[in-house]
Regions:
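Conserved N-terminal subdomain of the carbohydrate kinase-like
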Residues: 1-69, 73, 78-88
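Hydrophobic residues at beta-strand termini and immediately following loops
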Residues: 21, 172-173
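Residues that form or immediately flank small-molecule/cofactor binding pockets and catalytic motifs
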Residues: 23, 94, 159, 178
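Short, flexible active-site-adjacent loop segments at beta-strand->alpha-helix junctions, enriched
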Residues: 71, 93-95
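Structural detector of well-ordered beta-strand residues that form the stable sheet scaffold
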Residues: 89-90, 155
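Conserved phosphate/ATP/ADP-binding segment of small-molecule kinases
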Residues: 95, 99-172
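Short glycine/threonine-rich catalytic loop with a Thr-x-Gly-x-Asp
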Residues: 176-183
């Protein structure tokens, strides 16, 4: 497994301090895309990380703590209220919906979403994940539902646009991607 010196990787960034949390294993996956827009894919997983633990997190003074894992279990549910005691919480919800089962990646709804979304200031989801969470295919309606459940600002990505809802207005911006590889 390749080792990356995170402090060195981020050293050119001004005012950025990196606090790496180590795992003996890495997340290793392969994605096969089924459509040119890359909205639907099949993922196989060879390895996952050890879950982050609240007792490992240093005392960090930051305005926002961004929680972004690659699969369920990377960031345990208890990390969300823990982070909210220190800063505003931003979360990429894929870490709560993507489960590794039999070497593959499958999506399941987040059972504790209604309990934990009130701790979340910024919620990032893609259109498919928003549908899993809410059962709604209309992205604006899904954003409104996620807001009602407690998230304060919702960002939903789709291959055609980015949608943001702040509890008052729906904002959209078309995506004109030059390249979707690596999405």
């Amino acid at each position: 497994t390749a080792q990356v010196d995170l402090a060195a990787a981020f050293s050119p960034a001004p005012n950025v301090t990196v606090y790496p949390l180590h795992s003996r294993t890495s997340f290793v996956t392969k994605n096969v895309y089924h459509t040119p827009d890359r909205e639907r894919r099949t993922s196989t997983v060879d390895s996952v990380i050890e879950p982050y633990r609240t007792e490992e997190v240093p005392d960090i003074d930051a305005a926002i703590w961004h929680l972004a894992g690659l699969a369920a279990g990377d960031i345990p549910n208890e990390m969300i209220p823990f982070a909210a005691r220190h800063a505003m919480v931003a979360i990429d919800v894929q870490t709560m919906l993507r489960w590794v089962e039999n070497g593959g990646m499958v999506y399941h709804d987040w059972a504790e979403k209604k309990e934990l979304l009130p701790y979340v200031r910024f919620l990032k989801t893609d259109a498919a994940e928003a549908e899993i969470l809410t059962g709604l295919t209309d992205r604006a309606e899904a954003a409104r539902q996620l807001y009602q459940w407690g998230a304060k600002e919702i960002l939903i990505t789709h291959n055609t646009e980015v949608l943001v809802y702040d509890g008052r207005e729906i904002y959209t911006c078309p995506i004109r991607a030059r390249n979707l590889s690596g999405r």
